[in-house]
């Protein structure tokens, strides 16, 4: 059995395994994965907002207990960010193509950046309410997902299906954690301050986090970079149009 101090590190590193597999198996998504993963890793620095109110995991060098920060959160966020952004496209064989400039000027997109920033606006507004900080985080990502669908209806399917896929993906990882380290959830999560509802040993809030993270993050790259998704074969045909022909 893994010592408690290294369980969080082991679990965070486990998320890098599918990341590496997808990165090398599907090179067309490498740019997206790198950019989204690096951006998501920054959110690992928000860990002091959740320790010890939401959970209090033993960490390398006891960093979380001493400062609230930890290295594991950076690894974890990096791993889930890249996979969450491309999981739908990998499984449905979709690629990204840029949106034409005239389409960007349509009235539908006038709140483009506000929609993208909506989670960053929502979270601090809700954080100071008398509830556990995990709930404003969940609500903020849900608001971001709704804003994405309103601003970019073409991403609706990717948002909904991507959210469901990521929740299932995260569920498998968490179930492995609970199976390999029984009692870890009760030891680390602040169950009395949250719902206390466990589904196969997994806190309900973790599944809500996974669902809303997947909903927002599955389309964040396309939304931010002004891309849409198309079937891979269509993307290939569009690229071939620009290849020189033999005389």
Residue spans of the language-model regions?
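Hydrophobic transmembrane alpha-helical segments in integral membrane proteins
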Residues: 1-15
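Short juxtamembrane and helix-loop transition motifs at transmembrane-helix boundaries
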Residues: 1-5, 39, 62-63, 90-106, ...
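Short aromatic-rich membrane-water interface segments that cap or initiate transmembrane helices
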Residues: 2-5, 62-79, 193-208
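Hydrophobic cores of alpha-helical transmembrane segments in multi-pass inner/ER membrane proteins
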Residues: 12-20, 74-90, 140-147, 205-221
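Membrane-interface helix-boundary motifs at transmembrane edges
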Residues: 23-36, 97-105, 150-159
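Hydrophobic alpha-helical membrane-insertion segments
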Residues: 37-43, 160-175
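A generic, lipid-embedded transmembrane alpha helix
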Residues: 38-58
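Membrane-interfacial, low-structure loops and terminal tails that flank and connect transmembrane helices
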Residues: 94-111, 228-247
